[in-house]
Amino acid sequence: MTVSFLRIEIQNCSAGILRFLPRNPDLFAAIKPSSALASLYSTVSGQIEENPKRYEHHNVATCIATLQRCAQRKDYVSGQQIHGFMVRKGFLDDSPRAGTSLVNMYAKCGLMRRAVLVFGGSERDVFGYNALISGFVVNGSPLDAMETYREMRANGILPDKYTFPSLLKGSDAMELSDVKKVHGLAFKLGFDSDCYVGSGLVTSYSKFMSVEDAQKVFDELPDRDDSVLWNALVNGYSQIFRFEDALLVFSKMREEGVGVSRHTITSVLSAFTVSGDIDNGRSIHGLAVKTGSGSDIVVSNALIDMYGKSKWLEEANSIFEAMDERDLFTWNSVLCVHDYCGDHDGTLALFERMLCSGIRPDIVTLTTVLPTCGRLASLRQGREIHGYMIVSGLLNRKSSNEFIHNSLMDMYVKCGDLRDARMVFDSMRVKDSASWNIMINGYGVQSCGELALDMFSCMCRAGVKPDEITFVGLLQACSHSGFLNEGRNFLAQMETVYNILPTSDHYACVIDMLGRADKLEEAYELAISKPICDNPVVWRSILSSCRLHGNKDLALVAGKRLHELEPEHCGGYVLMSNVYVEAGKYEEVLDVRDAMRQQNVKKTPGCSWIVLKNGVHTFFTGNQTHPEFKSIHDWLSLVISHMHGHEYMTVDD
C-alpha cells in the first residue's frame, strides 16, 4: 500500500534506514520522527515558489523524465523544484516510480541523506532498493549498500538483474563468501549469464584473487564482447603474479576482436611492470599510441611507472614532458622513478616544479622526497618539507602514521641533525621498532655510543622487541665509540637472549669494532671461522684496520682475499695502495696501479657537495661541468697559493 509522503512516520522505516536519520536524543523522544521528512518537504516546497508556472503542464511521466536529466547533470536544484511540484500535485501517492526517480536523482547528486528520507516515504520495491544500493556504491559507501541489500532480502524482495551489477561494484565491503552467496542467488534466479552480472562477478572474484572462480564465470558467459570482462581477468591474473596467464587472456581478447580500451592497456602494462618484461611493454606502448590511448593520463602514468621500474629514465621523462595534463599520481610516479634511478638532484628539482605547478604533495610525495634530502644531506629542504607537513596538517601529535614520522626522523639522522631527529621521535604517539632503530643507528654513526645504548634500554622497557636491524645499530655504536666489551656481549646475547641469528652484517660490525681497537688477530680469526664472513665487506674492513694500525703482513692476506672476491672493484686496490704508501713501498704502489690498468679498474671519483641558498652543488674529481667551474677553480688556486705562502701543504703535496 502506498503511504502518503506527508504522513509517513519513521516507525515505518526499517532499522537499516533509521541510522541515517537525526539522532538528537532529546528531540527523538519528544516529537514524532516524521519531522525529518517534514523538514525536507518544507525545503522542496519552497523551491517551487521561484517559478510556480514552470512545471504547470507536467504529468508524472514528464516529471520522471526531467528527474532523470537532473540526475545525469547532477542538477539537484532543479531536482528539488520537481520534487516540490510532485508533492503538491500528489504524484508521489499515485506512482511508485516517482519515488524511485527521486531517490535516484538525490543519490546521483551525492545527497544520500535525502535519498534515504525519500526512500523511507516510498513504496518498497526492487526499483527503489536498486536506486539506493547504486547510490551508496557511487558515493563511496559500499558497506551501506551491502546492508541495504541484506534488508531488501529480509523484507522478502527478490533482486533483479540490475541489482547485482550495482551491488558487486561495492564488493570492497564484502568477504569472498559474500560474493559466492550473491553469485549463488544470481544463478538461482537465472541472471548469471547476463553480461553485466557476469562482469561484476569476474571483477569481484578477481579482487579477491580467486581467479579460478573468475575464469569459470568468464568461460560460461555467452556474450563476452565487453572489454571490462577481459580487463578484470587480466588484472586478476596479474595480482597473483600469473603473468603468462594474463598475457594469454590479452592475446585471446585481441583474437576475438574485442576492443582494447585504456583500462586494457594499463592492466597489461602493470603485468609487464611487475615482471620486468620491458620489450613486450614497449610493444604495448606502441599499441596504446596506435589506438589513441597513448595520451591518456592513466596510460601515461602506467608507462612512466613501467619504464621507471626498468630504470629507463630517459623514456619515462619523455612521456612525462609530453603530457598535457598531470595529476598527483603523475608527479609521484616520476619522482619515484628519479629517486629509484639514483637521480637525487633531479628528484628535488622535480619536486620544486611540482610545487610551482600548484599540485599539493601528499604523504606518498613526501616519503619519496624526504629520503632524497637525507641522501644529499640537504637539511634546508628537509626542514622546509617538515614545515609544510606541520602547516598542512599531515603531521601532528595525534597521527598514528609511524611511516611518515620515521621518514622525517631518518632524514634528520642522515643530515647529522640528531637534535631535530630526537624531537620528532619524542613527538610520536606510537613508536614501532623502526622508530627506535633509526635513533639507535643515528646515535651510533655519530659516535654517541652511550646515547645509543640508553635508547636500546628505553626500547626494551617500552616493550618493543628488538630485531636484526636493532643489533646492527648497536654494534655500529659500539664500534664507533670503542665499547669493545659491550659489543661482544651484544653479539653473544643475540642468540641466547633474543633468539636472533647473527648475519654477515652483524659480524662485519664486530670485526670492524675489533679492528678499530687494534684487535686485528681476533678480527682475522673471527673472519676465517665463520663462512658467512667471507665477503668483501668484512675483508675490506680488515684491510682498512690494517692500514690504520700499520699491520702490513695481515694487510697482504686481506688484500689478496679481497682481490679474489671482487677483482673488478677499485676499493681493495686503493686500500692496498694506501698501505704501501704509508709503509714507503712505492714500487708496490706502482704494481697495484699497473694491476688496476690491466683489469681495467677505475677508481670511483671522489665526490663532495655544499648546500647553498639556490640548492645543492655537487663536485666530482676531474669533472669540469659545473657552470661556475672557472670562478671556483680560480678562487681555489688563490687559497692554495696563500696556504703555500704560510708554509702549509695540501694533501697532494
Curated annotation (Swiss-Prot):
Q: Where is this region: Type E(+) motif?
A: 614-644
Name the domain of life.
Answer: Eukaryota
From the UniProt record, which GO molecular function terms apply?
Answer: RNA binding
Q: Name one Pfam family in it.
A: PPR_2
| GO annotation, biological process | RNA modification
- InterPro entries recorded for this chain? E_motif, Pentatricopeptide_rpt, PPR_At4g14850-like_plant, TPR-like_helical_dom_sf
Which stretches are PPR repeats?
59-93, 95-119, 125-159, 160-193, 194-224, 226-260, 261-295, 296-326, 327-361, 362-396, 401-431, 432-466, 467-497, 503-537
What residue spans carry the region label Type E motif?
538-613
UniProtKB keywords: Repeat
Q: Enumerate the SUPFAM superfamilies for this protein.
A: TPR-like
Q: What family does the entry list?
A: Belongs to the PPR family. PCMP-E subfamily.
From the Swiss-Prot or TrEMBL record, give the protein name: Pentatricopeptide repeat-containing protein At3g14730
Organism whose genome encodes this protein: Arabidopsis thaliana (Mouse-ear cress)
Question: What gene, per UniProt, encodes this protein?
Answer: PCMP-E31
